[in-house]
Amino acid sequence: MNTATRLNTATRPTTVARRCVAAALGVLLLLAGCTSGDEDTTPPPVPPTGAPLPSLPPYPEDTHPFGAHWDWNRYDEFLPYLRKLSGSATYHEISWCSIEPTAGQQDWTALDQIAQRSRELGIALNIKIRTEMCWATGGTPEYLRGTANKTESTMPLDMAAYQRFVGDVVRRYAPYGVRQYAIENEVNAPQYWRGTPEEFVTLVTAAAEAVHAADPTAVVVDSGISSVAYGFGVVDRLVRAGRDDEAITAYNAYFQRRIGTRGRKIPQVDTIETLRTALADETNSRNVAFLAATEQLIDDGVVQLRQVHYYEHFDGVPALLDYLSAENPSDVPIEAWEVGQFWRDGDGDDTSRAEEVVKVSTMLLAGGVRQVMWLPLGYNPNNRAGSEVRYGLLEPDGTEREAGRMFESLAVAARGATVSPVDQDGLTGVAFQRGEESTLVVWSTEVNDAVRVSPVPSLQTGAAGADLAPAGAEVTVSDRPMLLRAAGSPGSILADVD
């Protein structure tokens, strides 16, 4: 994907306010101790109040915005489906401590293979650079995750050495086409970052200098604040603005599948007092503080691309988009590197869950998010949860699910197309226009109120993931996503809607 580098270091009007919020919350975190937290793995919507997010330019020929993140240890199983996603983007996380476990002894073998395979697939690779904890940082980790025993990150002992490592990464992988580098991952979570928001700002500033020294065309990306933390950022903004009823509505829409999963951290909320208590929780205060620090980096131009993580119900997307339209500078692109479906013990069938994949992905894209990467491509049956907490597009062995077929149909429709939102006469969704042809992915906003579309010449229709067939008489669109394809603009296809 083409990316426009933004290196404007002028202070924006919101920067001073963000620094005040981050500093105040940082003090609260220090007073509270901030040493515990849960790992983020990745009602009606709030009416939009911010300015619309900028429209997206056409995707270059043979590229599209629907990517995924997968376990490279199962590359062979996933390969047939990955070929269908050619033209998309993905990311891979590395750490200084894993690449250079002993000072001066770097091993790039695994990452070289990933970069080479990504290039062969035609999938753009983004790299997340973490420190973790080892000789380069000192200290003893409190958290060990996975079979690789990944640890939290912290500040380097020698910042110049850290910058040399970051520069090594950029110089090595620029020839593979890597242009976007995220610094750390979900730093709002203690198991990913041991340090203050101020220390994180210092680290990213140093990393950005090294990235641009090695490749002036490269783009620095934030850590990707967690999905849960973004939810608390959404409601904190509304509460601070005195929009209490909207805050309660947004909270219950956003967290409807999380309520009760973390005890008092994400409680049932029906009063503003309960919501204020939740916001004051130590973990949730940390979430908001690190979101403010991230936005300071964006406002200052240190970070040129905002990375969003979203694992919630599609009812929460409008509130997130409203937040982003209000808080994100208009010249800073947004990409969702982690999009998924968190639903512990979810009871939805394969079709309804697949349709939700379509709705969440297209709503984000229609709202101005230019990349959507689904996580996981296929879940790990041996995960510590012992169940599929986040829904995969594929079975663990690579067998394509209905969700995978639907997601692929979005990639086909979007390849090389111009994206625009659809919001007309009870229909919502997204439109992809390529040349003289348009494909719309739409559904009715009301569960029990179908919308009727009069067919235009050449109109083909069908469910997402299914073969499209010529439309005969009037087309009925329910609350289940449907594809409409015909010659002409999106407006001409929807010229007669009832």
Task: Kindly give the residue locations of the regions a language model identified.
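C-terminal motif of bacterial Sec signal peptides marking the signal peptidase cleavage site
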Residues: 31-33
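Noncatalytic carbohydrate-binding groove/subsite architecture in carbohydrate-active enzymes
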Residues: 198-356
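Active-site groove signature of glycoside hydrolases
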Residues: 165-197, 221-231, 301-312, 336, ...
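N-terminal substrate-binding region of glycoside hydrolase catalytic domains
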Residues: 47-170, 178-192
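Bacterial signal peptide processing site
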Residues: 35-38
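Carbohydrate-binding surface patches
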Residues: 423-457
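Aromatic/acidic polysaccharide-binding cleft in carbohydrate-active enzymes
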Residues: 345, 349-407, 423
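C-terminal beta-strand-rich structural cap/linker in extracellular carbohydrate-active enzymes
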Residues: 468-498
